[in-house]
Amino acid sequence: MRVVVAEDAVLLRAGLVRLLTEAGHEVVADVDTAEDLLRAVEQHAPDFALVDVRLPPTFTDEGIRAAVLLRAQHPGIAVLVLSQYVEERYAAELIASRRDGLGYLLKDRVADVEQFLESVETVGAGGTVLDPEVVAQLLVRSRHRQDLELLSPREHEVLGLMAQGLSNASIAANLFLTESSVEKNIRSVFTKLG
C-alpha cells in the first residue's frame, strides 16, 4: 500500500514510517502539517493516509479537518486518524462520510504494534476501526438525542462489542458474521448516530 504519514512529532513520525515500511508498505511522503499532507496526497496519490488530529500551526484540529477534506476530495483514500483526544464533532463527521476505509485511534491506547498494523491493514482494505473511547464518546453524545432507539438489534450487538474494544474480526467471530457484515453494521450505526 502507498502511504502518506502526517505527524508533527518527529520521533513518532519516524517510528510510524519505519513500522509501515517494515510491514511492506511504501511510505511515499511523511509530513508535519495539514497543508503539506494535502499537497503530498495530490502529488503522490497514495492509497492510505495516516493523520495526527492536531497539527501545526495551532495544534487544534488541522489534521482532522484535513482528513475530512481528504475523504471528500479523494474518496478512494483510506484514512486512519491518530489522536490524544476524541474530537467528537469531527469524528462524527468523518464517520458519517459513509465511505469505506476509515479508522480513528487514540495514541495512548495503541500499545501493541501488531494490533496497530492489523488496524492499518483493516482500514487499508476498506474496513472500519474505531477506538473504544471514540465509540463511548459518540454514544454519550447520542444518548442525549435518543438516537440509540434507531439502531436494529444487530447494530446494538455490534456497538456493544465495539465499546468493549473488540476488533472487527473478533466481533465477526462472536456474532457468527463475516467481517464485511460487521463493517456494514458499523457504518450503519454511525450514520444513524451521526
List the predicted regions and their residue ranges.
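Two-component/phosphorelay signaling modules centered on CheY-like receiver
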Residues: 10-29
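The N-cap/first-turn positions of alpha helices
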Residues: 154-155
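Acidic, metal-coordinating helix/loop segments flanking the phosphotransfer/catalytic sites
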Residues: 30-48, 58
